[in-house]
Amino acid sequence: MHAKSLTELRAALAAKECSAVELAQLYLKRIDAARDLNAFVHVDADLTLAQAKAADAELARGAGGPLTGVPIAHKDVFVTRGWRSTAGSKMLENYQSPFDATVVARLQAAGMVTLGKTNMDEFAMGSSNENSAFGAVKNPWDTHAVPGGSSGGSSAAVAARLAPAATGTDTGGSIRQPASFAGVTGIKPTYGRVSRYGMIAFASSLDQGGPMAQSASDCALLLNAMAGFDERDSTSLERDDEDFTRHLGQPWTAGSDAARPLAGLRIGLPNEYFGAGLADDVRATIDAALKQYEALGATLVPVSLPKTELSIPVYYVIAPAEASSNLSRFDGVRFGHRAAQYGDLLDMYKKSRAEGFGPEVKRRILVGTYVLSHGYYDAYYLQAQKIRRIIAQDFQEAFKSCDVIMGPASPTVAWDLGAKGDDPVQMYLADIYTLSVSLAGLPGMSVPCGFGAGANAKRPVGLQIIGNYFNEARMLQVADAFQRATDWHKQVPAGV
């Protein structure tokens, strides 16, 4: 039962093969048995089973929708009433929100049952889920490896089938990279598609929530429930409701046939995504996936994204600048960690923040404060914003000759736990293929497409699919066609 997709689980509930309570109990037992992975930071069986009972009551009345009674885990960056909401930080280790984030509320309104809160890099700052105040998360495929970050708890939970789906957030790649490392499917929607209300902020012009699950079809179902305008989020976009499942299983064009369902699809391959720095085993796996797309009828087209290499310095100016402002609210006064001993008010601020924040968060606050300071704002922050606009223009130029862009989600497979902890720059370089997508506000997703080679033979590789603004339904169609022709997304770690 635990290996079933969301659609299969909902069908099992409708057929009375199990109840929502029994399903929740199954996953709670699996979570408890896999505590060594450290994927979850907070589980409350009573709260979960209460939601499951309510879902069973809905189903008994013949009511409910396509997700009623199906369990989900939430990244601990979404505030969730009843559960602690920590953002992976000591600063918020005992914080309980009086309200639900819009994403949480919408999924609960769709009938989903919350299993608990997943581990994450502190305030979503990291690429390995080693920056959490609650300990590192292990990759279920190889427990010596990282699961990616910052949504590493969510990716590990879905990969180990501790939950059929999970929420994540993506600021510079934090859905796509962990999805790649853990062999699951994850999508970052267009910026503004999913409400940020109740999402603990890192970098407000970049943060975006999205689903992580086994397949593109599962992600489409989840996005149906998650997306939509929210007047409480000033960056939320007013658009008509959309069915993200509407193209699944359909031919790309009227001239496509069953053997070549993607005939007419043009896939752009950026030269910059296949150059120096891309590991040989990742390149080989991505090449094999692209050949599969050609077999499905797609055409490969060379494109260029010339400012790709600048996305790292641009991101690491803009994101820390916004973080230094957003995290200024955590001062030990209204909420958050407060130092036990201090002199005056200023001393309390200093000690509370020094004790509450981890080293990576402190590093980014310092960088952000510096680039916003007098004399450096124009040289760094303003210049970064100008290049950000050029990066977005490069994508629009590329989309003139293709429908979607593809490439690796990460230049390597997951690295060993602790391998990059002493070298933050090497950690930052791991996001080179995802950062520009976030800076442009475009939708991007990662789908499992194989594994590394040699010593990395147990470590998954993800194919990144990038679409133009509001093109999620077509991206999901493209990913779904690949998953109908392959079974990479159905493979699970040993023992699962």
UniProtKB/Swiss-Prot annotation:
GO terms for cellular component: glutamyl-tRNA(Gln) amidotransferase complex. It comes from Burkholderia vietnamiensis (strain G4 / LMG 22486). The keyword Phosphoprotein does not apply. Allows the formation of correctly charged Gln-tRNA(Gln) through the transamidation of misacylated Glu-tRNA(Gln) in organisms which lack glutaminyl-tRNA synthetase. The reaction takes place in the presence of glutamine and ATP through an activated gamma-phospho-Glu-tRNA(Gln). Its EC number is 6.3.5.7. It catalyses: L-glutamyl-tRNA(Gln) + L-glutamine + ATP + H2O = L-glutaminyl-tRNA(Gln) + L-glutamate + ADP + phosphate + H(+). Belongs to the amidase family. GatA subfamily. Heterotrimer of A, B and C subunits. This is Glutamyl-tRNA(Gln) amidotransferase subunit A.
